[in-house]
Amino acid sequence: KFENFMRQGHYPQLNYLKKEKKEIHQAIRQKMINREDKRIVFEEQRMVAKFVSKGIYQTDYEGFNEYLHNKGMLPFVCDIDGRRINENLYWKEELEDFQNETAYYVVPSFNKKGKELNQYEPVIPDKDEETLILLFETNRKQLDVAIDKYEGFKKGLILCEELKSKRKLPHSYGSISLREYPPSYDQFAIYNEVGPDALIQFGKPNLKRLDKFIEKGLISKKEVDAFKTQIDQRLDFVVMSLDSEQRMLDNFHSKQLRIIEEQKKRA
């Protein structure tokens, strides 16, 4: 199957488009890096390019998990970090009965013939920002289609009985391997039957669930931030459609309004 996917050019195209996106992104960044205005709107193309300052934080997870436990929220917010459990033989054996069904993903490897098919490098023309923005948007649409096609193809591979059995299948361009995701666990069963220790030591907040608790006013962002320490600052460069930017702003404002409404209800 993967051999046909390669031969038909689907994977090489995906690989090329990923490289092209990175190169176009870098070209636009270089054009804008010395500008005073760190946010440029391209009205005709309905796109925006901007530099965004982002803090890098270190989180005291054990301290935060203790805090969640004291508030009665720990198993509702946290998942067990399977990677860290794998490194601890005692807890790996202790929690074995609470492990969820194993999930898998596929990984391609390439021989010389496969690498030759994937080696094409994009050449980005030295054009103005407007032209590069158009190239970026064209690439984004093509890349979205290529990614969707590959994700659908991988789902089919995961169901392949031969790959499930052998875990690795060779083909003309290399091989395809089936690998296990880190284990996931039933955190409620662990909390109720084993106790909170494993969740406190190895738990990591599920950000979506944590956001829901913040929105409901059950815990504040200030409480969460108390367990974070900023260790660095970086400047990210982002290119997106104006519609996407507006949706992000709308979602943020909606979330803030929901938090305010919940605070009023509890006042």
List the model feature ranges, each with a label:
Residues 15-123, 144-267:
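Extended, charge-rich alpha-helical segments
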